[in-house]
Amino acid sequence: MRRKLLFMILSFLFFFAIIFTLKCFSEEAATFVPKNYVIAYYFHGTFRCPTCHKLEQYSKEAIEANFKNELTSGKIVFKTVNVDEKANEHFVNDYQLYTRSLVISLVRGGKEEKFKNLTKIWEYVGNKQRFYDYVWDEIAAFLKEL
């Protein structure tokens, strides 16, 4: 009888310790999510021409090359979104999209405060460095507002 009671008590304590540990880890993980950040969306359709692929590639490269720390910390998030998919159609109206686009969005306290469609990516796609500089300047300006 004593062994059963001891086993039950130890089992309860072990179970309680596991629950407590998991709760601590989940709270710790939640603290690493920044409340203020910049999202860089590259919007495309299902059909993608070579220039569209290049726009996405340059956008991603410009952000990864210039903002490694911010990407790692979550201050910048890069997302590629197909607006032809039903779940993503709202972005066309949300950001007044009329073509393939790179849009940056400033989020504070979990709410979008402002956004900017970087329309000059089409103008600069033929000059990689100018493209990178343009994307860097625009994102850096948004980061200053965090």
What residues fall within each predicted segment?
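Structural micro-motif
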Residues: A87, V92-V107, E113
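Local sequence-structure signature of Cys/Sec-based thiol-disulfide redox active-site neighborhoods
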Residues: V33-A65
